[in-house]
Amino acid sequence: MMISDATMMQQNYYLNNAQKASDKALENIAAVRAISGVDSANLAIADSLRSQSSTIDQGVANAYDAIGVLQIADASLTNISQSADRLNELSVKMNNAALNDSQKGMLRTEATRIQESINDSFNNATYNGKNVFQTMNFVVGSGTETTNLNPLATDGLSIDSQDSITNFMDQLGSLRSEIGSGINAITSNINASVQNSINSKAAENNLLNNDMAKNVNDFNANYLKENAAAFVAAQSNMQLQSKIANLLQ
């Protein structure tokens, strides 16, 4: 049985479409490889940015801990300063010639208790179970912050020597000034680190969203369209082949 020219033309039409679909599929495969190559590089950069951002974020958390240490130390020094003021008052009273020995003894007893209270304030000032009046190193966003807060000696304090109290109060003032400067420096570091973290995350999102996600989604959409066309062509070709086979029987 002869196959009509129209049938042959229809067969060639579907075969040509199938071939074109196959060629397009190959082009898309090459495109996938190209996209994968680019996005692999972008992923590596994005991973690096994510790691950098995580490191910065942890540094910021460490910096906040450092500020917490300094704030607790400053609060303790505020109480100690008040105690030192009271010692200074007692020292002035001790110079009152009208006081008898019993009254002076009472002043010395109060001074001793205040001195013990000052020592307790130094010893009991803790952050997360650690005494804040020591040297601590904190790895923060831009390096290492060191808090060097050594407790002041109180052995030389005496209400019989106002100079000893004045000297102690001067040391307290210097220590509190260092704490204030430290808090300001760490706060500035935190602000810069947070901005760096935001920039890193924005760069990471741009890499993933603009390159990988968009390109891959575009490819997938086109690839599905081509596969659908190829599938239709293949199905039509199979139907033609079936008809030809039936005609040849």
UniProtKB/Swiss-Prot annotation:
The secreted form is about 1 kDa larger than the whole cell lysate form, presumably due to post-translational modification. A 22 kDa form is also found in the secreted fraction, probably resulting from proteolysis. Disruption phenotype: No visible effect on flagellar structure, cell shape or motility. Adheres to host epithelial cells (human HEp2) but invades less well (14% suriving bacteria, determined by bacterial counts from lysed cells after 2 hours of gentamicin treatment). Gene3D superfamilies: f41 fragment of flagellin, N-terminal domain (1.20.1330.10). Pfam families: Flagellin_N. Its main location: secreted. One of its GO terms (molecular function) is structural molecule activity. Keywords: Secreted, Virulence. GO terms for cellular component: bacterial-type flagellum; extracellular region; host cell surface. PANTHER family: FLAGELLIN. This is Secreted flagellin C. It comes from Campylobacter jejuni subsp. jejuni serotype O:2 (strain ATCC 700819 / NCTC 11168). The gene is flaC.
